[in-house]
């Protein structure tokens, strides 16, 4: 089967529309910012619009035409702070109304589905995350 790549500026608004209608959407995210839990070119995510988002949720957000799929690491009223699991620093901020959907399932190759964790342990490992990610990228992915 041929692979079709649709630019985010076309795809994501349509995904947002489907999610707003109450539908679930399965898509394959691009980029390595959610390694090691969501792997580019291997994993798909299933998104759903939820009434309430919580710290630890992985969300798809619209940052003014730039779209990211990152984890909520802090919540202050209507304001959210996001960070990719594969990042060692650098965060994004947005308001809750910019959340298009929440990852409810990660689909691995072969069709096995896993429910995403809240990432509490991974957040606690932030001081050593750079070393864990280096090991993952240099060694684990080669196995």
Where does each model-flagged region fall?
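Extended hydrophobic leader/signal-anchor segments used for secretion and membrane insertion
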Residues: 1-143
């Amino acid at each position: 089967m041929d692979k079709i790549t649709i630019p985010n500026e076309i795809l994501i608004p349509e995904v947002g529309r489907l999610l707003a209608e109450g539908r679930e959407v399965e898509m394959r995210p691009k980029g390595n910012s959610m390694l090691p839990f969501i792997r580019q070119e291997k994993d798909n995510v299933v998104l759903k619009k939820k009434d309430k988002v919580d710290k630890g949720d992985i969300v798809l957000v619209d940052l003014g035409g730039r779209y990211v799929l990152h984890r909520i690491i802090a919540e202050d009223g209507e304001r959210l702070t996001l960070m990719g699991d594969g990042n060692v620093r650098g965060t994004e901020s947005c308001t809750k109304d910019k959340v298009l959907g929440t990852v409810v399932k990660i689909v691995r190759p072969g069709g096995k589905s896993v429910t995403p964790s809240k990432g509490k342990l991974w957040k606690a490992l932030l001081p050593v995350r750079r070393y864990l990610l280096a090991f993952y990228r240099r060694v684990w992915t080669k196995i």
